[in-house]
Amino acid sequence: MQKIKLKVSPFFKNLFGPPIEIEEAAGMVSHAANLFASVQLWECAGKAFFKSGDMLLQKNKNSIAAASSFVDAANAFKKIDSYEAINCLSKAIEVYTCLGKFYTVARCHMNIAAIYENDILELDKAIFHYENASGYYGGEGYNKLSDDCMLLIARLSIQKEDFDRAGKIFEQVGYNRMNTMLSKYESRHQLLYAIMCYLCSDVSRAKRSLDKYKDIFPAFKDFKECKFIEKILAACETKNIETFTSAIEEYDHGNTIDEALMSMLLTIRKATFEDEVE
């Protein structure tokens, strides 16, 4: 009688065989998570990735693989549950901080900030996490990335009509980039935004800032950004709305006026030319 040989799969070996190592079990759970993600079962994927990370932490509380699993869980939950995604990223931050992976900590804070800004619409919490990201980037010597985070805070501050804080940030970043050869001429944008922020509440302060920037950075006076703000300031001083509108149209012809700048121009227009508009 011919003997029949049964081929036992690794799954059943693990199921009925001796206990498996926790890393192997976590790997199996992670594999399941990837399968869930491949068919867009985001909640199942997120829970499985998180479980995998949790299992790895039981073996090693400073497991970088666990932190990576928490980030994967966050990416899955981001599709369906912003708050759960934040919880997963916060868990990853704890591990990365213990490991001294501060650049990655900064990236996690950036991701949390973006969720608060774009999905949950809680600007104060977004600002808090951008500040954290800026601090960690700066501590690791990534000064441009640190400044980029601060610029995001400045733009959110404009949305909150905190023009003083926004102006100070734009000014500081402008100074920082002014002293760096590769980004020296980028500073003209930050200086323009700083003056616009100040102009939203105080024409005299805006004028003083313009004079100061031209003294510190003589090349600034030759840039179109400087010429634009000079025309805007002149229009505000004389309360000439035609000059104000003409300056904006001229600048817009060769430049993109983004949402933040447009918001400030509308604020300035309303505050300065309210009678003329009516």
From Swiss-Prot:
<keyword id="KW-0813">Transport</keyword>
<dbReference type="InterPro" id="IPR011990">
    <property type="entry name" value="TPR-like_helical_dom_sf"/>
</dbReference>
<dbReference type="GO" id="GO:0015031">
    <property type="term" value="P:protein transport"/>
</dbReference>
<protein>
    <recommendedName>
        <fullName>Soluble NSF attachment protein homolog FPV011</fullName>
    </recommendedName>
</protein>
<comment type="similarity">
    <text>Belongs to the SNAP family.</text>
</comment>
<dbReference type="GO" id="GO:0005483">
    <property type="term" value="F:soluble NSF attachment protein activity"/>
</dbReference>
<dbReference type="Pfam" id="PF14938">
    <property type="entry name" value="SNAP"/>
</dbReference>
<dbReference type="InterPro" id="IPR000744">
    <property type="entry name" value="NSF_attach"/>
</dbReference>
<keyword id="KW-0653">Protein transport</keyword>
<dbReference type="GO" id="GO:0035494">
    <property type="term" value="P:SNARE complex disassembly"/>
</dbReference>
<dbReference type="GO" id="GO:0019905">
    <property type="term" value="F:syntaxin binding"/>
</dbReference>
